[in-house]
Amino acid sequence: MVAIALCAGLAVKVLDAPHSFPSRVNPQPTGPPVVPGRTLRAALAAAVTFDPKPGAVDVALDGRVVVNANAGRLTSVRATTTTNWPLFGTLSTSGKRWQSNGPLVPGISYQVTATVSGSAGVAAKSTSTFRTLTPVATVTATVFPDGLTVGVAQPIVIRFNHFITTAAARTAVLQRFTVTESPPVPGGWHWFNNRELHLRPQMFWPVGEKVTVTSDLNGWNAGNGMWGEGTTRAQFTIGNAHVAVANLATHQMAVTDNGRLIATYPFSGGRDMYPTMNGVHIVLDRESVVHMVSSTNGIPVNSPDGYDELVYYDVHITDSGEYVHAAPWSVDSQGRSNVSHGCINLSPGDALAFFGFSRVGDVVWVVGGPRPPERGDHGVMDWETKWNDWTPAVVHNMFPPPAVKTRAPASRTPPRHAR
């Protein structure tokens, strides 16, 4: 049935009962469903992932903390230890990824809080905690020389407080040291034992060279459960080229300063039973007086070859106890024959002059004798180790890793006195 009604000139058609008008009061949405803000915030927070994973323990110290936003964009990330020590990082330009910049602190808990924003200004936070490992031991390093003017043969000596035995740790630690100098020169690294790493130039250092060594061992995996700790900075300058050539066959020592001959000293070297070591020695240290005792070299004091006395103007050139020093008892033999226990004997006047001239790292080059250099002796090992056994590097900024070599440590205590 259809009814027609006229009302003010407007015709309205009224449908039979089975038909009805579409609703105009609550129209149905035609777009995507509307998600409440609380639900969106929860979804944003759930889309944030952390590495290390939440609740992780024994986290390695050389890793990086990474936060990813799989929905929305990261607007801030705050990472701190439980003692409020901050861990800084970098947020990508896309806002999708944050990564920490530095190593982690050992044996402590971290809290990482990420803020992420989505559409329509909705923001959410997500938090994760983890704990780093506690090292079996921490490894530190010292650098020598530091704050000194040294001779042209002086190596850079890095000593660790624990044995570094794994190839991976030895390779990785090289990336922790930066060596800069002006101008750059060819150089090389060499491990002489498990605790001692040296660097020297291929040839003697240029006169006037200024060298800076810095390191950051934090986050270095030193192997066997040990981790590096601490930073170092050392600076030194290369002085004039002091080179003394001691000829055991002629009993004369020629001393030059930057290539200019300044003195020739008659001397007496080690006799047949106690020959002086050949090779390029470096001055290890100087002492105005040394109490020399023969028992330090296995010679009983009360034997015919024994001695126990104060010796003056001592320039130390080997671990085995060789010095250039004053020897008034052998003046008659100096320039004529070798009668010492291995040291280079000078007259008191010449010894005083040489003592005043010498500095750590100077060259004392011994030639003409029968005794070869001992490669484990700090006095000769740097310049008597063939250059092919060093890993070449340009002495400037970073160095490539060295060949891994393990040799018995050369002990320098207690001191030995050849006389």
Name what the model sees in each region.
Residues 225-332:
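Gly/Pro-biased beta-strand-loop elements
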Residues 152, 278, 294-419:
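Exported/periplasmic cell-wall-interacting domains
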Residues 85, 219, 261, 351, ...:
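Surface-exposed, flexible loop/turn segments at secondary-structure boundaries
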Residues 113, 176, 252, 313-314, ...:
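Conserved beta-strand and immediately adjacent loop positions that scaffold enzyme active sites
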Residues 158, 162, 203, 251, ...:
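Solvent-exposed, polar/charged alpha-helical surfaces in well-ordered, non-transmembrane soluble domains
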Residues 197, 238, 245-248, 345-350:
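Short, glycine/acidic-rich beta->alpha junctions
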Residues 1-240, 267:
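Acidic, low-complexity Ser/Thr/Gly/Pro-rich repeat segments typical of extracellular/periplasmic
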